C-alpha cells in the first residue's frame, strides 16, 4: 500500500480516480487499524474537513496547488481567527458541529461555530471564498470555553438563587427544548429604568406620526446568550425591540468593538431591497448595542399579530450580516421608510439610567453621594458614575491642596522680611561715625557715601565757580550750588504747579508751603505761647521775642529794639532808620574828637557802639 505525505494509506486507484482521495483520508485517521464493523469506515469529521468538493480533483486551497499531484489532499491551511498556518489535523471547519456532538443523531440544538460566534459577539461570519473556512484547535477550544462561561453568567446575573431551575432528578431525562427554556425564563425577565425610559420615549415618538396603538407582539427566547428581548409594535408595521438586559449587551458590544472590523462598502449594493423591515433581518441595525436577534431563535407570537418570521441560517451568514455593529438605540421604522425618531445613543444610556433612578431612590443616593464626597481622596480606583466630571474635580482639589501647602513648605530665597529694621536697630545701638580726615574740618557723617561726597566737593575739587550770567558776580565753590542758583535766579522755569489755584513755583518746598494755605495746616508750633506757623524761619524769628532783654546785647538807639547779633542790628538800622544812618555819615570831619588814645566806648569804621554794663 502506498502512503501520502501525511502517512495516510492510498487505494490502488487513487492516482487516477478523484473520488478515492476521501476514502484514503478516512483510512488514515485509523492509521491502518481495522474498524469495528470489519470494513474500512469513513470518518465523518474527516469528510467534513475535506479541502474541496468530492467531485473536484484538482481543487486547491489557499496555499496553492498540490505539489505531489492532483489526487492528494492539501496539507496546510490558515486559521480564520489567529491567522496562523496549521496542518489539516490541527484545523476545524467553521460550519461543523462542536466537539463531542453526536454524529449519528444530529440534533437541532447542536452548536456550530458560525452561528455561535454571531450569537456571542453579534458579528456574522461571512462565507467568503477568499477567506479561510477553518479555525485551529486552540482557537476553537478557547472560543467554546468563553462561550459557555459567558452564557452561564448572562443567565445568572439578573436572576435570584431562589428562582433557578432545579436540575433534572432523573439521569436519563432529556434537557428542555428551546421553547420550554424560553417559557421558564419568562419569570426571570427584568426591566430597568433605562429600558422603560426607552420604551416610553418610543411610544411618544410613535404617537406623533402614527395613530395605531402599539402593543406587545412577541418575546424572543433566551437562546441568544441568555438575553431576553421583547418586541413591541403596531398594526402599521412599526416595531420596537425592548432590550431587558442592556448591561450584558453593552459588555458584548465592548468586546466586539475591540476588534476593528473593516467596513465592506462592496456589500452595501447587494442588500435585498424587496424585504420588509424586521428586527430579525439584520442584527447590527435592529439593536441598540449591536447585538441582533439570533439566527434561528424561537419566538412566541401573539395570535392577534402578523409579523414576518426571522430569516434562515443561509440568510444570516450572507452579505447582509457582514456589517460591523452600530452603537445606536433601536429606531422606529416603517416599511420603506427611515427611522422617524432616534433615541439617545448608548454613550448616554448610563447617565439616563442614573438620572431615572434618582427619582425613586433620592434618599439613598443622597447618602451615597455624601459618603463619596467625604471619601473622594481616599481611593483613586473607586468607581464613579461620571468619571470625566470626577477627574476634573480631583485635579482642582489637588491644585488647591498644592497651593495651600506651598507657603508652608517652600521658603523664599534671600533675606527674611524685616532685615532692614534689624540693621537699623543695630546701627542705633552702635552708630558708625565717619569723621573728615582733613585737618581743621569738623564734618561728621553716618554713611561712607556722604563722607566721600563731602571730601570730593570740599577738599579735592575745590575751585571757584563764578556765575556765567553777565552782571552776576557771585562765585560758588560747589558745582551743585551754582546749578541751583542759576535755576532759581536766572531762569523762569517753574515746574511745580498748585492743583488748587494754578500758581507755579520753582522749588518743591515752596509748593508744599503754599498748599498748606489751602488746607489751613500749620505744623510748627511755639513751645512757650503756642504760636503756630508753616515755615521754620517764622518760628525761629518768633522765638527771639521770648528771650530776656539781658540776653540781647545789641540795642537800637532810635527805637530801643534789641538784637542778638550786631549784624541783625545793622540790618535793622539800614531798613528801619536809614535817614539817621546817613546823617551820622555826613558829619564833618572836624567834629571828630582830637587824636588821642581811643576810648573803649568808641570803635572805628562805623561799628556799632557796645554799651558798658551798668
UniProtKB/Swiss-Prot annotation:
May be involved in transcriptional regulation. Pfam families: zf-AD (PF07776), zf-C2H2 (PF00096). The gene is ZNF276. Residues 591-600 have a biased composition (Pro residues). The keyword S-adenosyl-L-methionine does not apply. Its main location: nucleus. GO terms for biological process: regulation of transcription by RNA polymerase II. Zn(2+) binds at residues 79, 82, 136, 139. Residues 386-408 have a biased composition (Basic and acidic residues). Residues 409-420 have a biased composition (Basic residues). The keyword Zinc applies. Gene3D superfamilies: Classic Zinc Finger. GO terms for molecular function: chromatin insulator sequence binding; sequence-specific double-stranded DNA binding; zinc ion binding. This is Zinc finger protein 276. It is found in: Nucleus; Chromosome, Centromere, Kinetochore. Residues 77-163 form the ZAD domain. InterPro entries: Znf_AD, Znf_C2H2_sf, Znf_C2H2_type.
Amino acid at each position: 500500500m502506498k502512503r501520502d505525505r501525511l502517512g495516510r494509506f492510498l487505494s490502488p486507484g487513487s492516482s487516477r480516480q478523484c473520488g478515492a482521495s476521501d476514502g484514503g483520508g478516512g483510512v488514515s485517521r485509523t492509521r491502518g487499524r481495522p474498524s469495528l464493523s470489519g470494513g474500512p469506515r469513513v470518518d465523518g469529521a474527516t469528510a467534513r474537513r475535506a479541502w474541496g468538493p468530492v467531485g473536484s480533483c484538482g481543487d486547491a486551497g489557499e496555499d496553492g496547488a498540490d505539489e505531489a499531484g492532483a489526487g492528494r489532499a492539501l496539507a496546510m491551511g490558515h486559521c480564520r481567527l489567529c491567522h496562523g498556518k496549521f496542518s489539516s489535523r490541527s484545523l476545524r471547519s467553521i460550519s461543523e458541529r462542536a466537539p463531542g456532538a453526536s454524529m449519528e443523531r444530529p440534533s437541532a440544538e447542536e452548536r456550530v461555530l458560525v452561528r455561535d460566534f454571531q450569537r456571542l459577539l453579534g458579528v456574522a461570519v461571512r462565507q467568503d471564498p477568499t477567506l479561510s473556512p477553518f479555525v485551529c484547535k486552540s482557537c476553537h477550544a478557547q472560543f467554546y470555553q468563553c462561550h459557555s462561561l459567558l452564557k452561564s453568567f448572562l443567565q445568572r446575573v439578573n436572576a435570584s438563587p431562589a428562582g433557578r431551575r432545579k436540575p433534572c432528578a432523573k439521569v436519563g431525562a432529556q434537557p428542555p427544548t428551546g421553547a420550554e427554556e424560553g417559557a421558564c425564563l419568562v419569570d426571570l425577565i427584568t426591566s430597568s429604568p433605562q429600558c422603560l425610559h426607552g420604551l416610553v420615549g418610543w411610544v411618544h415618538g410613535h404617537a406623533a406620526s402614527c395613530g395605531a396603538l402599539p402593543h406587545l407582539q412577541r418575546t424572543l427566547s433566551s437562546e441568544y446568550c441568555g438575553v431576553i428581548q421583547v418586541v413591541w409594535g403596531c398594526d402599521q408595521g412599526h416595531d420596537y425591540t425592548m432590550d431587558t438586559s442592556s448591561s450584558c449587551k453593552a459588555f458584548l458590544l465592548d468586546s466586539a468593538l475591540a476588534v476593528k472590523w473593516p467596513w465592506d462598502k462592496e456589500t452595501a449594493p447587494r442588500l435585498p431591497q424587496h424585504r420588509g423591515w424586521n428586527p430579525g433581518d439584520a442584527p447590527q441595525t435592529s439593536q441598540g448595542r449591536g447585538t441582533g436577534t439570533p439566527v434561528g431563535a424561537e419566538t412566541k407570537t401573539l395570535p392577534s399579530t402578523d409579523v414576518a418570521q426571522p430569516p434562515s441560517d443561509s440568510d444570516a451568514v450572507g452579505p447582509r450580516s457582514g456589517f460591523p455593529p452600530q452603537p445606536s438605540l433601536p429606531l422606529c421604522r416603517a416599511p420603506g421608510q427611515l427611522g422617524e425618531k432616534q433615541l439617545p445613543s448608548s454613550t448616554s444610556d448610563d447617565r439616563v439610567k442614573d438620572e431615572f433612578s434618582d427619582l425613586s431612590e433620592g434618599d439613598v443616593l443622597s447618602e451615597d453621594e455624601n459618603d463619596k464626597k467625604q471619601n473622594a481622596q481616599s481611593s483613586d480606583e473607586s468607581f464613579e458614575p461620571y468619571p470625566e466630571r470626577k477627574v476634573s474635580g480631583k485635579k482642582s482639589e489637588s491644585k488647591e491642596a498644592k497651593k495651600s501647602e506651598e507657603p508652608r513648605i517652600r521658603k523664599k530665597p534671600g533675606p527674611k522680611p524685616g532685615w532692614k529694621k534689624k540693621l537699623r536697630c543695630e546701627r542705633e545701638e552702635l552708630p558708625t561715625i565717619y569723621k573728615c580726615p582733613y585737618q581743621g574740618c569738623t564734618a561728621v557723617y553716618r554713611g561712607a557715601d556722604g563722607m566721600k561726597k563731602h571730601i570730593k566737593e570740599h577738599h579735592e575739587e575745590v575751585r571757584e565757580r563764578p556765575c556765567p550770567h553777565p552782571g552776576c558776580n557771585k562765585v560758588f565753590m560747589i558745582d551743585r550750588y551754582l546749578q541751583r542758583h542759576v535755576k532759581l535766579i536766572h531762569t523762569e522755569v517753574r515746574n511745580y504747579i498748585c492743583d488748587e489755584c494754578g500758581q507755579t513755583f520753582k522749588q518743591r518746598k515752596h509748593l508744599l508751603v503754599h498748599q498748606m494755605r489751602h488746607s489751613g495746616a500749620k505744623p510748627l508750633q511755639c513751645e512757650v505761647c503756642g504760636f503756630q506757623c508753616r515755615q521754620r524761619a517764622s518760628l525761629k524769628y518768633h522765638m527771639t521775642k521770648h528771650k530776656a532783654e539781658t540776653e540781647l546785647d545789641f540795642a537800637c538807639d532810635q527805637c530801643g529794639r534789641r538784637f542778638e547779633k550786631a549784624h541783625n542790628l545793622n540790618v535793622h538800622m539800614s531798613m528801619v532808620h536809614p535817614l539817621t544812618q546817613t546823617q551820622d555819615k555826613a558829619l564833618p570831619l572836624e567834629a571828630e574828637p582830637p587824636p588821642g588814645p581811643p576810648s573803649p566806648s568808641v570803635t572805628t569804621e562805623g561799628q556799632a557802639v557796645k554799651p558798658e554794663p551798668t
